[in-house]
């Protein structure tokens, strides 16, 4: 069942440099940005991953991997598994829901769902506005809304999330595990999942081949 999860509070981003690929300073938080895994990433769960940071503060960080499909399951099938509908053919999903991707959002709480969506949809006490017109909702109500045609225009559903303890993400960035850059809705919600990693690098002016050759020196 999709349920609300604890997450660190959003931090003050006033001192953040947009599009910065280097280390971050203490108190300079990355919610609303993308993390891009470096080729030296040893954890296979995050290899070539692009992660949208939903919350980052002194309490830690939480994000959703936006380029890792959850096998062959699609959104209508998931609605059946969650008992929102009995059969996919019983409902007529709007076009954006028919193509809605189900992703592996990360290794934490993989039995729970988290919906990243455009900011044209809001549920009081459930929706977290993040940045650049992107919000996060983690209740089953948003799935019912999408199924009935009353949901957000753009959305992706992720099973699980990526989480970091206090200071852990900062350390990984300093150790050249991640690059980071500004996010945009077209990249986050795009259907070209296989291209998201290269597109994120291009936002920093980096060619993937060049990054591979210079791993650890970005």
UniProtKB/Swiss-Prot annotation:
One of its GO terms (cellular component) is cytosol. Residues 1-26 are annotated as: Disordered. Coiled coil: none annotated. InterPro entries: AlgH-like (IPR003774). Belongs to the UPF0301 (AlgH) family. It comes from Rhodopseudomonas palustris (strain HaA2). SUPFAM superfamilies: VC0467-like. This is UPF0301 protein RPB_4502. HAMAP family: UPF0301 (MF_00758). Pfam families: DUF179.
């Amino acid at each position: 069942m999709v349920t609300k999860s604890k997450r660190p509070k959003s931090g003050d981003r006033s001192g953040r440099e947009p599009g910065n690929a280097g280390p971050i300073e203490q108190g300079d938080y990355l919610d609303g940005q993308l993390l891009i895994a470096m080729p030296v990433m040893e954890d296979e769960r995050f290899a070539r991953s692009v992660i949208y940071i939903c919350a980052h503060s002194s309490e830690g960080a939480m994000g959703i991997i936006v380029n890792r499909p959850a096998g062959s399951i699609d959104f209508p099938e998931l609605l059946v598994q969650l008992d929102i509908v009995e059969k996919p053919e019983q409902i007529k999903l709007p076009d954006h829901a028919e193509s809605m991707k189900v992703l592996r959002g990360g290794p934490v709480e993989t039995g729970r769902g988290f919906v990243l969506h455009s900011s044209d949809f809001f549920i009081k006490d459930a929706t977290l506005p993040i940045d650049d017109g992107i919000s996060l909702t983690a209740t089953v109500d948003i799935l019912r809304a999408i199924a009935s045609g009353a949901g957000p225009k753009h959305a992706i559903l992720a099973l699980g999330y990526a989480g970091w303890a206090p200071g852990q993400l900062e350390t990984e960035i300093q150790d050249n595990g991640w690059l980071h850059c500004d996010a945009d809705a077209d990249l986050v919600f795009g259907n070209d999942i296989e291209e998201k990693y290269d597109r994120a690098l291009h936002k920093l002016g980096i060619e993937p081949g060049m990054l591979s050759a210079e791993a650890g020196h970005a």
